[in-house]
């Protein structure tokens, strides 16, 4: 059996439980074909680089698959028939990644506070130790 990574994008107007149901249906196709799905990752609702079938966003899902090629072809056929699937990409790999994918790692990095957020330090413009430089308004010469 060969190892595959499959990423698919589902329509933006379906709910997260519907995406999970779709993922389970695709996993069942693989298991019925004699393979197994070792990892299922839901990457969330993300922007698409360009409009695909009138959608600007999509639910991204990653599957790590260990299956014969016939099962993978059947899964790809079912995805092409399904209206909820916008795009798919299935590639054959030498070995499957253990742990979270790069997308999930970057997602956890985005959860950290950004630089300057959450600091208790005073900001430069909030310093009270500097004297205020109030000056009188300028007058135009020869006007009044």
Swiss-Prot record:
It comes from Paramagnetospirillum magneticum (strain ATCC 700264 / AMB-1) (Magnetospirillum magneticum). CDD domains: bS6. Pfam families: Ribosomal_S6. GO terms for molecular function: small ribosomal subunit rRNA binding; structural constituent of ribosome. The gene is rpsF. Binds together with bS18 to 16S ribosomal RNA. One of its GO terms (biological process) is translation. Residues 95-144 are annotated as: Disordered. This is Small ribosomal subunit protein bS6. GO terms for cellular component: cytosolic small ribosomal subunit.
């Amino acid at each position: 059996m060969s190892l595959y990574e499959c990423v698919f994008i589902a329509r933006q107007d379906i709910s997260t439980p519907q995406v999970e149901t779709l993922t389970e249906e695709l996993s069942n196709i693989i298991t019925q074909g004699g393979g197994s799905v070792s990892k299922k990752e839901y990457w969330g609702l993300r922007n698409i680089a360009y409009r695909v079938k009138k959608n600007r966003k999509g639910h991204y899902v990653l599957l790590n698959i260990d299956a014969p090629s016939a099962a993978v072809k059947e899964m790809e056929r079912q995805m092409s028939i399904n209206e909820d699937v916008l795009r798919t990409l299935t590639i054959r790999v030498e070995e499957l990644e253990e742990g979270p994918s790069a997308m999930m790692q970057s997602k956890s990095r985005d959860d950290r506070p950004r630089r300057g957020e959450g600091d208790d330090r005073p900001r430069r413009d909030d310093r009270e130790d500097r004297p205020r430089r109030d000056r009188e308004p300028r007058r135009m010469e020869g006007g009044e």
